[in-house]
Curated annotation (Swiss-Prot):
Species per Swiss-Prot/TrEMBL record: Yarrowia lipolytica (strain CLIB 122 / E 150) (Yeast)
Bias-annotated ranges (Basic and acidic residues): 1-12
Keywords per UniProt: ATP-binding, Cytoplasm, DNA damage, DNA repair, DNA-binding, Helicase, Hydrolase, Metal-binding, Nucleotide-binding, Nucleus, Zinc, Zinc-finger
Its job: Probable helicase, member of the UBC2/RAD6 epistasis group. Functions with DNA repair protein RAD18 in error-free postreplication DNA repair. Involved in the maintenance of wild-type rates of instability of simple repetitive sequences such as poly(GT) repeats. Seems to be involved in maintaining a balance which acts in favor of error-prone non-homologous joining during DNA double-strand breaks repairs.
Cellular localisation: Cytoplasm; Nucleus
Low complexity bias spans: 317-328
Protein name: DNA repair protein RAD5
Keyword Magnesium appears in the UniProt entry: no
Record's GO cellular component terms: cytoplasm; nucleus
Domain Helicase ATP-binding: 427-607
Gene3D superfamilies noted in UniProt: P-loop containing nucleotide triphosphate hydrolases, Tandem AAA-ATPase domain, Zinc/RING finger domain, C3HC4 (zinc finger)
Major localisation: cytoplasm
Zinc finger annotations (RING-type) as residue ranges: 782-826
Amino acid sequence: MEPRQKKARFFDSEEDFGPDTKSLIRPGSSHKPGKPASNSLARPTPAPSTFRSDLEAFLGPLSDQRFGLLLAKSKGNVEQAVNIHFDLPEEVQQATSEETAEEAEVSQTTTSGFETTQKPSQNTQVPSRVHTRGGCSTSRFIGSLVVTAWASKSSKGKVKYQDRLVVERQSHDHSKSIRKNPTDNSHVHIRTVSGELLGRISGEHDYSIASLIDSRVCDFEASCVYADHNLSLGSNFVVELKCYLTEEAFQDVAMPLLDSKTAKKREYVFDNSRESHVEKMLRNRQIAIVDLFGKLNLIKENEANADMVKDMLRAKSQPPSSQPPSQNSEDESEPIPTDELDALYKRIEKEDVEQPETEVEGFPLELRRYQKQGLTWMISRETEVSEYFDNDDSGPINPLWTKVDFPGSDEKFYVNFSSGALTLKFPKQERSFSGGILADEMGLGKTISTLAMVYRDRHVGCTLVVAPMSLLWQWEQECERVGLSTYVYHEKGADIDLDELFKTYSPNILITSYHTLVSHYGQIKALGGGLDRNVISETSSHERPKIFTKHFHRIVLDEAHVIKNRNTVSAKACCLLRATNKWALTGTPIHNRLEDLFSILKFLGAAPWNDFIYWRNFITLPFQEGKIVSALMTVQCILEPIVLRRTKNMKQADGSPLVVLPKKTINIEKVALTDQERVIYSYVLARAQTSLQKSEASEAVGRNYLNILTQILRLRQSCCDPALILRPEAEVPTDEQLQIEENESQLKSMIQQYNDDTQTSACEYSSEIIAQLQDQSAPPECPICAEDVTKLAISKCLHMGCVDCLADNVRFQESKKQTPVCCICRQPAALKDIFEVERTGEDCKDIRLKKLSDRPRSSKLVALVSKLKQLPKDAKSVVFSQFTSYLDIIQTELRREKIQAFRFDGTLSRQQRTDVLKAFGLSKGSVLLISLKTGGVGLNLVTANHAFIMDPWWTFAQEAQAIDRIHRMGQTKDVHVTRFIVENSVEEKMLKIQQQKMVLAGTLGMSEQEQKAQRIENIKTLLGE
């Protein structure tokens, strides 16, 4: 048989289009045998409304069957479609003759590219059916699509027009595959009703359809629109999909994603991993619903949020393989520009000028006016909360939800395109939780305000207070002051059975720590199948920690920013707690990242913002895309109704200050390094500069970033005390968890020489001078202070005086960059050459010369001791440092100077912390040594009015938090703060960075690449000359 002669083409084409599979593969595509061809076209696809009209302008009216064939062959290209029409007249006529009356139903659809949206007649009943997967339930028809499928094998006469087909996903546990492989298998197979595999849906549609099937949102019925009689591998055929919403689609958005056995046994509580399999499936569901509803044209133009949904359609997320979510929680969102964060806090501040005042009858403490107004607001936040969903649709609809009509019916349902949730009930705009965030600035009495609220309804139920371990004693003490009964559920106190406790003793307030919750949460691993599941086994409820099963009247998280990282066990544990009312107390609900707020909202149950899908779509993603103002405005809208924030600088209605506090003075004390200290500092600086230069030369600054930060850490330590450089620091600041290399013999030698420089023994002094000291019946007069010597010392030049006078003379000259000399004979002098004279034995005739110091005092330590000695004898001081090893050195020196010092840091137990704070409060003229990290959390230290900051933090906000532990409500004296800064050092440059509101760990409000570049510039600034 001779081959058919092709007719002259209506259009010229670079290709011949025949029935072979080559004609269906885009030129230049990376198609391989057994692989589906790409669905994208070599030429732009005409607009959906013009393709059919343009085609019929050349060929005349076309039936849907003929149009389907040309659409599949030409892939939407008019020129190719016309040429195919004339090249294959026999096939076209055969396809036309096979058209049946049932085509009328298909012809009622309107074509949109490769998709059609069915519009059933208003007089016809909406298609519905019963599906059996997952149990019997009714599915509701919402529209139909025409999609292109790819033949996965060759076949002959297996499928023809209007044959019913089966849509099938691979039978495997999708939740497990998500956990194992971040790239999901999104293939959707098409089979005949007899089960024979024909192919799979093309890549343009398979991801969304697969997600909808996996999440049990939709069922699909398929039928053939067009297929070649002889299907070859890689060829296309056209399928119509009828879409049905399942009953499960309207259930809790989280529960259907668990397998049926797990769903019956487990209670979904808190999903707080970086992105768990549940969060991933929810995100996939949301993307697929947005995609499907867009294709079905179910979004009306007059809906209030139609523009938002269309934006989501235009920029809908890519499949996870192309845009995987961040696996680092800290990078989930970029840092907030400092100016924007300050402005956000300013906008949510409440003046309360119109807020009425609430008195608490019998409350023993006097509340200030702003506290009474705040109490009114807090009480209003604990009023009864109505159900989030209500059948009464007379009120305003929640702005995040959109009303959608079932096709051909007066019935409707509601969809939240930001989360993928569906409901048949009217979503009213209602308050979703009871409680809020009390975010008053530090020192305005958040604790007293909370206790007043508890006291008001103390007989209603128990309030659980969760606080850092260092504040447990403070809460217990404050409760006792106002007459509230307490029980401290911590350490040994946490071993008690809560049910038994409340049978015999019902405290007004149960006080526990975040540490205790973390400890109890660890028990869930054995009971609930693992912490990564974020679920608790109901079958083991009798063994579950009782603090997670008891329903409290109220829960208060003090210093709630402790749970700012949603991946921490502290955050997860707090979100398991159950209560009618929930409160978060924190002066900084947002520290420097928007993600800081998410965990607090999750704890509060602030729907819908406690759902990570909402948070990601409305806040995280816009912020990462540079829409900073828009994202922060959304955060402002979230916070305004649930946050009460006042600051010390605010005014009351009559213009008077909100709170009157004593004056606070902050001074910067410049400290000069000694020559030996400068040598060590210069050596460390040179090493850091060399490291930076080598990294720049090899373009590896980013890879060596931590190593360079290590060098900067050494510089900071050498400013405090050179001995710190080689000490393993147990409590290095959180942004500097860096290891210090110790195999540098030259640096070790320099520091050893600094510590042990030229030991002088008493035997160098002549026996004549010792004898002269033994014969003295009374102490000599000091040549420096001209008073009787109470603590005798002798120098190498054999001149005597007060030990402090001789030592201070040397230190003063060193601070002025002068060579120290004796004030009497002008011979060279040094601290190592001064010995304290100790008399022992009968008549104090036995003389012992004691070296002034076992090691030299650093310049900062000298400056601190000098300042402390200048204070009145009964003055109390607090000394802050980031380095606990430095606090060890300071403590040793203060003891040597007979200055009473107490130590407060993270190494102390709760009882030890309580004892330290009590002793410091009762003492006079004492010093409290405290780590900056511990001192920045909740402590009330108003018994002291002098503060010394030994080393600067990267941001002054951290130092300000520590200072406000002294300068707060209850302080009656002026507060004096001294910040010690070494001249011509990295510390001075850190002050400049503070003033520019920049942070080394990441410059704010820039793209990732800009942040990296700015970090490098900051390093250059710190290490520059």
